[in-house]
């Protein structure tokens, strides 16, 4: 800068200092009014706001101490005790000062602490523009901008237009030199040029891009600084409470060291070995088991896939193999051994009771001999005549009835198919069975429990309130014991029992938390899912990485290290017990060497030969048998598929063939021979007991003659009347009962389908209904009554131990009151505060922390997501925010603070800048002078803002009431509960965990209520009945739509 211009500025400064000294000697300071809560104008020189003071005197101002609280701002920082008295016009001031010329550097003006300015009147002639003048009247001072020239007070030197630095477009001057700033740039101590919304560092000349911020280092994007040093945290990283280690993604550290656990990893109980996916370690050592592997009970041999060990040794059985009771012979598929020897029976075969004859397919033996019955054959009540298909037995004997069978009311014979029970006995009921009210008989299907005992309930079972019986399905636990809870289990408040699915940790122990686990405040337990680190280690966790127990080597993906070194294993790899050889997939090594076995391979007992698939070795040599092959007892002939050999030679029988009892004739398919000769019967044929007449298909003969009965016909006990289908006769007469019907014990009332009668009357119960033990109230579906009253429990409800309150689905009550906990809720150890989803309580109080929240080290303020605390107080910074150098002012995105010469602003005010605007948190809506909101467009145009107060908008944070926000791009959904967010995330991931369990149905759903609604299609359940026309519907919305036909509203 020209030395003459600097000299002129010094002369002006001396002039004002002289005026201040004169006024100090002559004037007294008036009493100062209360200071106003106003923020002085803080803008660049070219946007300074001038207010007309013509013909009026400004009110006196009290002493105002302006002290910068940040000692590291470069440049000359002013500390002044500025006292301003009422201004009056000075007639001697006749010179002008150009608005186009600005003093913009602290270094150019040497202020003197304690200086005062009095008796100065600024009188603008009009609203200032680029070419207008502002006249400042003072003695012996004239500054003119006529013809773009500048005259200094101390000389006649004239600065021409070419000598004045030109500011183009949106450029402005820095406060320390001639550097030009573009756009929203600002600088403090150097000549560095900042572009497009940059902020500046406090101690260096480093350039920051975009929404960067920093303390003393560079922070990019959403980075933030740790509270104890300058470590940079990216994205969702967090640091440990005792060090500067950065955590990535879902990482956490182990409780005993610096090992990093990634994804779903956990460590072993005896060391720091990392387990991947579904891995676990053996009970005797730290050997890692991959996939479905397990070890034997006597050694550490690894079993792959579906292998199990024999009871007498460590031989590995593959697939569906099992061993015989007398030796270690391997049985394949559906094979089993005979009771008298080691003969192998193939799929569907069984032995006769008198010998080792093999029965193939659906064959059974007659009661008088070893004749084989094929298909659905049975014998008559007077002999060994074979009955086929859906045949039934006469009512004069206890012979078994097939397909569609029912029992007479005079005996306890088994009823097949849709059997029901008589009311006079405790016989087992099949299909949709129910129990009587007088006994503890098992109930099948949709069983429910009687109120007088603790019998096991199947299906959607629930437990009684008087014992700790196991509950299946969506079980819940009683409040009086620590029984294991399945499905949506929760923990009782009296013990450290394991909680499954959606588990949370109790506050009294270090129990493992599954799913979206968090750690307890009293221990270093491993946390899964959205894990965080314990306070005892500093290791960095990246993605799915973890470290080895002996060093800080980083393992990526599904890697794990060997027990003897730091070799990295990928995927499902494992190392051998004797070396570091890597095994891939389902590989394992032999017990005698390091040979690698692939897939379902296993080695022979005599050597290291590898057997593939379902292969096994013969008992006499090392020949490999494939698939379902086996060898004959007399030689090493190989039998394929369902083949077997005859007892007298090595003839091979194919598929369903069997030998006759008198020779080696081969019978094919369902053939059998007659009892008098070797005639072959085809298909379902049989011969009568009196001759060799052949009966075809479903035919049979009556017991008194050779009359042929077709299909499913049977004769009555009093004559030869033919009964069709599933018909049977009653015990008191010839009334015909149709398929599924039965008689009551007190009369001839017909019961249809699965009906049964009550113990006190002839009321018919439908489907899965039953009656209560104290009255004839009908319970439908899965309902049951409480032991203390007749309150009806629906679905999976259970009652509390202290009252009759009904608990739904996965609910449980607290140990101190009857408060109901829903879903994954649990209570704290010190009070009944309810924790939802992934919440956990702080170590100093019962405040609930959501999702990825953590507590600050100095107080109970909650930090969300990528928030960090400022180094001086508990202010939370979001995303790209940074704090000002000396106070709680928050800068967002590309914001910056500006300083105006002559009207300096301290950096201790509690105000914030949003985007290109500036606002105050205090009195933001009041039109006080100095509380002006300037648009960034004013800076770009280089114009002064108009003299009016613009309304400022407060920063609104909708995430406060809905802290769980969807992280997918372009999705702005947020929820107040974590479980709601998890359900929503399934729309993005396509996850459908609720699968229909009906055979042949492949439907899957994201929500349980959708699955329950779908199941009604299979069951045919239509519980919603129209009160007008008696039509029923499976869904309530269908009933509402139907109600419009009658012009009524449902429920009215």
Swiss-Prot record:
Similarity-based family: Belongs to the krueppel C2H2-type zinc-finger protein family.
Broad class of the protein's primary localization: nucleus
Record's keyword terms, sorted: Metal-binding, Nucleus, Repeat, Zinc, Zinc-finger
Signal peptide: none
Compartments it resides in: Nucleus
GO biological process annotation, one example: regulation of transcription by RNA polymerase II
Coiled-coil blocks: none
Native species: Homo sapiens (Human)
Identification of the protein by name: Kruppel-like factor 18
Keyword Zinc-finger: yes
Gene3D superfamilies: Classic Zinc Finger, Serralysin-like metalloprotease, C-terminal
Gene Ontology MF: a single term: zinc ion binding
Zinc fingers typed C2H2-type, residue spans: 964-988, 994-1018, 1024-1046
An example Gene Ontology CC term for this record: nucleus
Superkingdom to which the source organism belongs: Eukaryota
InterPro entries: Serralysin-like_metalloprot_C (IPR011049), Znf_C2H2_sf (IPR036236), Znf_C2H2_type (IPR013087)
């Amino acid at each position: 800068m020209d030395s003459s211009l600097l000299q002129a500025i010094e002369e002006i400064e001396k002039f004002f200092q002289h005026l201040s000294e004169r006024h100090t000697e002559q004037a007294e300071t008036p009493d100062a009014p209360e200071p106003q809560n106003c923020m002085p104008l803080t803008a660049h020189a070219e946007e300074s706001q001038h207010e007309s003071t013509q013909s009026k005197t400004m009110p006196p101002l009290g002493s105002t101490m302006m002290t910068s609280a940040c000692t590291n701002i470069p440049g000359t920082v002013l500390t002044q005790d500025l006292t301003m008295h009422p201004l009056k016009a000075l007639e001697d001031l006749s010179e002008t000062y150009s608005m186009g010329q600005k003093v913009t550097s602290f270094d150019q003006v040497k202020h003197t602490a304690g200086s005062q300015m009095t008796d100065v009147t600024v009188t603008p002639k009009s609203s200032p523009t680029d070419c207008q003048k502002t006249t400042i009247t003072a003695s012996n001072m004239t500054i003119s901008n006529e013809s773009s020239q500048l005259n200094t007070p101390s000389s006649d030197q004239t600065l021409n237009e070419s000598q004045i630095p030109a500011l183009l477009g949106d450029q402005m001057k820095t406060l320390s030199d001639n550097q030009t700033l573009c756009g929203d740039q600002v600088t403090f101590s150097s000549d560095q040029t900042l572009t497009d919304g940059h902020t500046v560092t406090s101690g260096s000349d480093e350039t920051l891009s975009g929404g960067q911020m920093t303390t003393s280092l560079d922070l990019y994007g959403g980075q933030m600084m740790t509270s104890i040093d300058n470590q940079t945290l990216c994205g969702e990283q967090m640091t440990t409470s005792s060090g500067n280690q950065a955590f990535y993604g879902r990482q956490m550290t182990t409780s005993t060291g610096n090992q990093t656990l990634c994804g779903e990893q956990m460590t072993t109980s005896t060391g720091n070995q990392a387990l991947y996916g579904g891995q676990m370690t053996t009970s005797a050592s730290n050997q890692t088991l991959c996939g479905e592997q397990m070890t034997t009970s006597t050694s550490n041999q690894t079993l792959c896939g579906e292998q199990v060990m024999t009871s007498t040794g460590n031989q590995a059985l593959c697939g569906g193999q099992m061993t015989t009771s007398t030796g270690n012979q391997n049985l394949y598929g559906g094979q089993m051994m005979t009771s008298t020897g080691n003969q192998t029976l193939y799929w569907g075969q069984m032995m006769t009771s008198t010998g080792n004859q093999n029965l193939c397919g659906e064959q059974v033996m007659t009661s008088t001999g070893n004749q084989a019955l094929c298909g659905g054959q049975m014998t008559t009540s007077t002999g060994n005549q074979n009955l086929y298909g859906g045949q039934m037995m006469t009512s004069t004997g206890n012979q078994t009835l097939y397909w569609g069978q029912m029992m007479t009311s005079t005996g306890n014979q088994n009823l097949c198919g849709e059997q029901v029970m008589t009311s006079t006995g405790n016989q087992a009921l099949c299909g949709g069975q129910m129990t009587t009210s007088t006994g503890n008989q098992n109930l099948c299907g949709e069983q429910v429990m009687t109120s007088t005992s603790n019998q096991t309930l199947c299906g959607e079972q629930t437990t009684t309130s008087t014992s700790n019986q196991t509950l299946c399905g969506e079980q819940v636990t009683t409040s009086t014991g620590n029984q294991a809870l399945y499905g949506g289990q929760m923990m009782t408040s009296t013990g450290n029992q394991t909680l499954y699915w959606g588990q949370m940790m109790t506050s009294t122990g270090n129990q493992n938390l599954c799913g979206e686990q968090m750690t307890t405040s009293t221990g270093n337990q491993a946390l899964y899912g959205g894990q965080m680190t314990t306070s005892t280690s500093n290791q960095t966790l990246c993605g799915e990485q973890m470290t080895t127990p002996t060093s800080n080597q980083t393992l990526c993906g599904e890697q794990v290290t060997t027990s003897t070194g730091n070799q990295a294993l990928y995927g499902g790899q494992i190392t051998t017990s004797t070396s570091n050889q890597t095994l891939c997939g389902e590989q394992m090594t032999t017990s005698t060497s390091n040979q690698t076995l692939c897939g379902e391979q296993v080695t022979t007992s005599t050597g290291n030969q590898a057997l593939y698939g379902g292969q096994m070795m013969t008992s006499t040599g090392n020949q490999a048998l494939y698939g379902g092959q086996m060898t004959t007892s007399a030689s090493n002939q190989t039998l394929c598929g369902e083949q077997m050999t005859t007892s007298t030679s090595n003839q091979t029988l194919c598929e369903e063939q069997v030998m006759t009892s008198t020779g080696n004739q081969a019978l094919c398919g369902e053939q059998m021979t007659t009892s008098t000769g070797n005639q072959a019967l085809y298909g379902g044929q049989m011969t009568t007991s009196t001759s060799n007449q052949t009966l075809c298909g479903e035919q049979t003969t009556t017991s008194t003659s050779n009359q042929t009965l077709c299909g499913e016909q049977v004769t009555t006990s009093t004559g030869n009347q033919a009964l069709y289908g599933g018909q049977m006769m009653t015990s008191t007469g010839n009334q015909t009962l149709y398929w599924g019907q039965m008689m009551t014990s007190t009369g001839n009332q017909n019961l249809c389908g699965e009906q049964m009668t009550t113990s006190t009357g002839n009321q018919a119960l439908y489907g899965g209904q039953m009656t209560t033990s104290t009255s004839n109230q009908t319970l439908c579906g899965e309902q049951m009554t409480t032991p203390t009253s007749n309150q009806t429990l629906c679905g999976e409800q259970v009652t509390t131990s202290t009252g009759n309150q009904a608990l739904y689905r996965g609910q449980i009550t607290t140990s101190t009151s009857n408060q109901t906990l829903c879903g994954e809720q649990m209570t704290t150890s010190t009070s009944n505060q309810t924790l939802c989803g992934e919440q956990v309580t702080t170590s100093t109080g019962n405040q609930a922390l959501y999702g990825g929240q953590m507590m600050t080290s100095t107080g109970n303020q909650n930090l969300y997501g990528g928030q960090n605390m400022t180094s001086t107080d508990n202010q939370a910074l979001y995303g790209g925010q940074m704090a000002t150098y000396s106070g709680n002012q928050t800068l967002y995105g590309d914001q910056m603070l500006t300083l105006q010469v002559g009207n300096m602003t301290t950096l201790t005010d509690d105000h914030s800048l949003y985007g290109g605007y500036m606002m105050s948190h205090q009195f933001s809506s009041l039109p006080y002078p100095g509380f002006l909101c300037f648009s960034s467009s004013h800076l770009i145009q280089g114009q002064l803002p108009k003299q009016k107060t613009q309304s400022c908008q407060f920063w609104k944070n909708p995430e406060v009431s809905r802290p769980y926000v969807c992280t997918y791009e372009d999705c702005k959904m947020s929820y107040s509960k974590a479980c709601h967010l998890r359900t929503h995330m399934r729309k993005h991931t396509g996850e459908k965990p609720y699968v229909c369990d009906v055979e042949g149905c492949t439907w899957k759903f994201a929500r349980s209520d959708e699955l329950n609604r779908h199941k009604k299609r299979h069951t045919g359940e239509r519980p919603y009945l129209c009160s007008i026309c008696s039509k029923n519907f499976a869904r309530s919305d269908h009933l509402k739509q139907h109600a419009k036909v009658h012009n009524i509203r449902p429920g009215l």
